[in-house]
Amino acid sequence: MADPGGRFRRDYNRANFTFKHGLAGNTLFELSALAALARRGGALGPHYWASGAVPAGGGWSDGTVGRQTLPDTITNIEHNDSIVILRSVEQDPMFAPLLQNLLVDIVELTGERMRADVAAGEVAVVLNSPERITPYHMDADPAFHLLIAGEHAIHVFDHADRTLVSARELEDFYAVGRRRAECRPGRLNDSNDHELLAGAGVHVPGGAPHWAKNHGQVSIALRVSYVLRSVERLRTLHRFNRRLRRLGLTPAPPGVAPWRDRLKLAAANSFNALRASHGGAAGGRQGPVWRPPK
């Protein structure tokens, strides 16, 4: 990967943009190899797969009942109107050398602003049947989508537009983990539209609503995402605000008053430490995790 225009450094987590990569046609990502990956299991997962037509405004639970096994869904994906997301593929021994280097390369391209903020990273392989729609949704963490095979369109909305996603909806998103987003009536066309061919990619900032439409072939893509310390702080603030709201208060959204945010973070961290000392539930992903080299 290269960044001759400097967009990785300039626009990372601020704006969506396209880029080129050299993974198109890589034989590691042929369907037979991915079906074998699904059968191996190991430290990967939890995976997601669903079959059957879903509209742009549909939900992630649609099509998860009565589906084929994961390996069979991958093998027959040309004909079964499915989406498959294989998670934590950077932990598989066959894929680790390539994908863990990719995680490092993107951080290096993006520079110190990202490097100082990254706590962990993950690579998912995303497969789509011809004409398949990925529903409108948001992800908290910034991501880089790299198309390896096929053609599809991805539609990305402005992550800072509070007329699309209100402050209260953001609180629900971060505090509850509600990944699905509700698209405002008449706003589906207010996106930046990117038509991707194999060898192209797009960066989606954290919190940016987006949806995708595959074209006439099976598509295979990578979703490279990063857990950021700044996003974890934001999530903590939204959860703290939610507790205050339950007490009948009306807290200011994060970012309005930085000094209040600092007080909330200190209080939340003290509460979480006390809870952990008394055997409270621990958060975070289970299993091996990629972390940036020192």
Protein language model regions, located:
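Catalytic core of Fe(II)/2-oxoglutarate
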Residues: 185-244
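Double-stranded beta-helix
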Residues: 149-203, 208-209
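N-terminal accessory scaffold of Fe(II)-dependent oxygenases
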Residues: 1-174, 221, 227, 231-294
